[in-house]
Amino acid sequence: MFLNCHSYHSLRYGTISVEDLVQQALDYNIKTLALTDINTVTGIYDFYKLCTANNIKPIAGVEIRIENELYYICLAKNQKGIGEINRLLTAYNCDGIEIPKHHPTFENVFVLYPLQNIPEKLLDHEFIGIRQDELNLLIQPALKKWVHKMVILHPVTFKTAEEYELHKILRAIDHNTLITKLSEGDYCKDTETLVNKKLLLNKYQYEPQIIENTKIVVNECSFDFDFSTPKNKKHFTESKENDVKLLRQLAYEGLSKRYTADHPQAQARVEKELAVIEKLNFCAYFLITWDIVQYSDHMGFMHVGRGSGANSMVSYCIGITDICPLELDLYFERFLNLNRKTPPDFDVDWSWQNRDAILEYIFRKYGKDHVAFCGTNVEFKYKSIFREVGKAFGLPKEELDALAGKPMTQHDDNSVFRLVHQYGKLLEKYPNQRSMHSCGILISEEPITNYSALEMPPKGFPIVQFDMHTAEEIGLEKFDILSQRGLGTIKDTVELIKEKRGITIDIKDTAISKDETKCNEFLSIGKTIGCFYIESPAMRGLLRRLKCDNYKVLVAASSIIRPGVAQSGMMKEYIFRHNNPTKFEYFHEVFKKELGETYGIMVYQEDVIKIALHFGGLSAPDGDVLRRAMSGKGRSLSALQKVKDHFFESCKELGHPEGLSKEVYRQIESFAGYSFCKAHSASYAVESYQSLYLKVYYPIEFMVCA
């Protein structure tokens, strides 16, 4: 019966999170619920999961509004209907095609008009929504004639009286005006909250046809989504078999180039990886990334493949990455294994000068109907919250500055400030606007509008209306297309050297720069200003303290400079142990066995996982939850808490003293959000060497381009 519910994804309008909306429905024993946020489908997948987990039938839809005017409410009969709604919104958002006020072209969508927008005739799938406070209008013959096409309309926008005031504040923020200057059409009615279903039906007891029509709409709507199947582009060629053949061919061609002599260990690694990639149906993902890199090479662009993808020998052989996994003992399983159900995640950097050309190629090659950026929700932040709420209350700039710049305890005597603070606290974590993910591109098999409406931000590339977490959950894994200045400096320097000196440098051949003698001399004394990632005062100081004179030490340095390691005290300890390898004791025997290469210090994500598994006795899946939390990819605090609880339970069972277990977990936690995987550090170290080589041997050209 509740066919028009808003969550806080109705930006600067709704006040209820999807979780709270479903929980409130559960409290009222409501068995069917429709989420119809204003012009967006952002929340429908979280809504679906929460509803089905609580035995509530979910209905997906959208409320179509242009400014303050409600055109109609769209309710999808099925998954096809969601796609039809998405395409209506996409045409408006991206192509500027005006949304029709009546009779949008739908085959699998119910349309509910408000009384204020009734067309001259209604199609079979179109109805009129009538609110309980509008029932008395049915005495008018002009409306009474439509009763046979009416349904119950009870919008839901807020939960409590306090949230109703918050709704008004949001509307004032949206209109950039004062709360007192809002007109009635700017905000919702004070009845727009969930109520007991029986009480609602009682209001319509004298219009049984309206109740019956509502039941018909509810029964004919079905939102059923398969989260388990991959939604990415399935094949690079025309079939899986040809993808397998092409990837194998490219891998062996690259193998012969990367390793000139016969190399049975490398060949065995390639075979092992190809078997896993084929079994998991990820050949297309590798080939699409290879194709993008091929285009980049053809255009003469520099790129760096980094992240966990650099653990892969196949990635190395086909040119996506440039570090040898065997040299650094990098585990392919860290990137891809048979327990992983989602596609791998390649991170590839280009120069900021070339990134747009790469993006344009992707959209052109794979089709605008199948490519879009991930979206991201920009939330209200602390200072901006109080500025925005304060403006809605009419505070002048000086008071806004004071409000945002001082702790609340210093404003206790100001009643308006206390009110602003009260409502501002409610807005924490509320989405304020949608924006473009910095680098995540989605390439889908089916039209991407089957899953989301698209929006067109100022950057000029379309975005989906959900974030990367939702994308991954529904089966869309992103390609990370990043940019940085360092690659542009290297490319420009190489071109300038050729122009001025007539010397061609194959800077992509890492053998000429990595562990080069003179480069290592510069490295060990921190003479690295202008060089990628190793030019900051902190990094130059670290290089000097480590007396860093080779690639492997630079790889470690690239990771221990991160805030998590430094703040935990482990960076200082690593420096001591590196310079005094016989003057320390390992924290525990497990640390000596698993972390001997890094002197018993957790430096990389892999090291943290090793300790969690071998000291804490966690399972591999729990280790992956921990890894994802550390890399910022996890969003389930409850899942992380379960892993933490299990860690301490397991440590107790293994006989570890409680104090020891707490200290180990403290070290693990200090890495959260900051630690690098080893392959990522190695990729950065290669680029550092490339820029250092140019600085050492061609300083004038390098400094001109830096």
Please provide the spans of the model-predicted regions:
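Noncatalytic, beta-rich nucleic-acid-contacting surfaces in large DNA/RNA-processing enzymes
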Residues: T32-L35, C51-N54, T191, S239-A706
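Short acidic/histidine-rich active-site segments
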Residues: K149-E162, G305-S308, H437
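A generic structural signal for well-ordered alpha-helical segments
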Residues: A25, C51, L143-K145, V218, ...
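Short, ordered loop/turn segments at secondary-structure junctions
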Residues: I38, E63-I64, V156, S308
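Active-site-adjacent beta->alpha loops and helix N-cap segments on the catalytic face
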Residues: T15-V18, T40-L50, L135-L143
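Conserved active-site carboxylates
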Residues: F2-H9, S17-T32, I56-D133, I152, ...
